[in-house]
């Protein structure tokens, strides 16, 4: 395993741990999700370039599209929650309430 792969795997693991441990604020959760998506994108791109798979060269672009959609939905949810409740605490969110 090369040093670059190990760094990207460590970045993914740290982002995952940040998502699991520090989930009190919605903004920190969204930043951890973006870090995970970015490290996945870099790892997939490096793997495809190293193995010379021309048929799979579109997969990282599709992942970036999903990451952009996830970021847009997350930010719109963050704006809605912060204007409604005045804070972005994840603990105050309950999907069963109206």
From Swiss-Prot:
Q: What class of enzyme is it?
A: translocase
Q: Where are the transmembrane segments?
A: 1-21, 29-49, 61-81
GO BP term, example: ATP synthesis coupled electron transport
Record carries keyword S-adenosyl-L-methionine? no
EC number of the protein: 7.1.1.2
Q: Which InterPro entries match?
A: NADH_UbQ_OxRdtase_chain4L/K, NUOK/Mnh_C1-like
The record's catalysed reaction(s) read:
a ubiquinone + NADH + 5 H(+)(in) = a ubiquinol + NAD(+) + 4 H(+)(out)
One of the record's GO cellular component terms: respiratory chain complex I
What's a single GO MF annotation on this record?
NADH dehydrogenase (ubiquinone) activity
Q: How does it sit in the membrane?
A: Multi-pass membrane protein
Record keywords: Electron transport, Membrane, Mitochondrion, Mitochondrion inner membrane, NAD, Respiratory chain, Translocase, Transmembrane, Transmembrane helix, Transport, Ubiquinone
State the compartments where it is located. Mitochondrion inner membrane
Please give the family membership noted in the entry.
Belongs to the complex I subunit 4L family.
Question: What is known about its subunit structure?
Answer: Core subunit of respiratory chain NADH dehydrogenase (Complex I) which is composed of 45 different subunits.
Q: What does this protein do?
A: Core subunit of the mitochondrial membrane respiratory chain NADH dehydrogenase (Complex I) which catalyzes electron transfer from NADH through the respiratory chain, using ubiquinone as an electron acceptor. Part of the enzyme membrane arm which is embedded in the lipid bilayer and involved in proton translocation.
Report the PANTHER family cross-referenced here: NADH-UBIQUINONE OXIDOREDUCTASE CHAIN 4L (PTHR11434:SF0), NADH-UBIQUINONE OXIDOREDUCTASE SUBUNIT ND4L (PTHR11434)
Q: What is this protein called?
A: NADH-ubiquinone oxidoreductase chain 4L
Underlying gene: MT-ND4L
């Amino acid at each position: 395993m090369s040093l670059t792969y190990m760094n990207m795997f460590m970045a993914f693991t740290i982002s995952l741990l940040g998502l699991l441990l520090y989930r009190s604020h919605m903004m920190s959760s969204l930043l951890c999700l973006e870090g995970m998506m970015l490290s996945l994108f870099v790892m997939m791109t490096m793997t495809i370039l190293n193995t010379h798979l021309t048929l799979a060269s579109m997969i990282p672009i599709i992942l970036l599209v999903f990451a952009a959609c996830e970021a847009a939905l997350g930010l719109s949810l963050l704006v809605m929650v912060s204007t409604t409740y005045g804070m972005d605490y994840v603990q105050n969110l309950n999907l069963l309430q109206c």
